[in-house]
Amino acid sequence: MPFNLDELLAAYSTYQRFVALEPNPHHLRYIFPLFEGTYFAYRKIDVLRVTHIAKSISTKPSYIDIGCGYGDFLRKVREYIPNAIGIENDFTLFHILKKPKPDYIYLGPIEGFDKKAVDTAFVGWMEPGVDFRKFVASVANCVITTFDEGGQCGINGGCEYEEFGLQRIAYWRTPSWIDVNTELMNKYYTPSLLSQDTRSHLKSLRSSHNLWYVYSKKDFSNCVREGLHNWIQNEKTMTEMFDFESILDECGYHFKETLQASMSKEPLWEVIFDVDSHDLDGSFHKSPLMKSKDTDQ
């Protein structure tokens, strides 16, 4: 993602001053996601969903993370797909952080990528005003993308891939880093401004704005759907977590929790298969996002 150097340096200076206060290190990834985390909050279960979707296409899938930043999410994926690569259009961040660039992250725009098919492309963030979806759809058999429900990505908030010939298979909802940031700030960093009653009230209003969409080309839709469905059965007994997931729980974003103030009533991390996607038992999981369309017809 492109950065204004002066703004980046100013942000990094603020980050350094904050680090000097010795806060909870897990707070940093949600307060300064550019330097410590990602622009989307995730759990280990998200990493495993992504990797199992990729492996449903091939036992040794080709995988590319587009706009991977310094590779926070990509590193987690590489634990399961060792040949996964990333592409980043701006290496300024590596210089600012004084971090060596891994050899599996490549510099340049995605349009300069050697146009050969990849099994799975992950798009965790698309800079406002930038739109590379057409190219991604042309090279990837499966696209997994995350974006803020407010449409703060691409051109005119366009983050979907149906218009480029891909079929949406499923989606799930998680908090954005901003959602978590708000809860952390209210709880830990504005104590003099908020009474306990006020903090409790604000917590009851918390919402969740990040969506994960799974797309595929038609020829791969069945295996992607089946791979995701089969993996979900394993989640029922899964106990593995990243250490930083404790912050999500602490802020009220538990796995499968339903937020009372949210416009959408599906539980967090609940996989919803699209209206035209059958579960293996023949049932439908209809997306709540489709209801308004049905009503209009």
Give the ranges of each region predicted by the language model:
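Short, polar loop motifs at secondary-structure junctions
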Residues: 69-71, 88-93, 127-128, 148-151
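Class I SAM-dependent methyltransferase SAM/SAH-binding core
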Residues: 72-109
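Rossmann-like AdoMet/SAM-dependent catalytic core
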Residues: 183-297
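A short SAM/SAH-binding and catalytic strip from SAM-dependent methyltransferases
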Residues: 119-131
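S-adenosyl-L-methionine
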Residues: 1-57, 273, 282-292, 296
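Short amphipathic alpha-helix with an adjacent loop that forms part of the alpha/beta core around
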Residues: 54, 108-116
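C-terminal substrate-binding/active-site "lid" region of AdoMet-derived donor-dependent transferases
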Residues: 129-219
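Conserved class I S-adenosyl-L-methionine
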Residues: 60-69
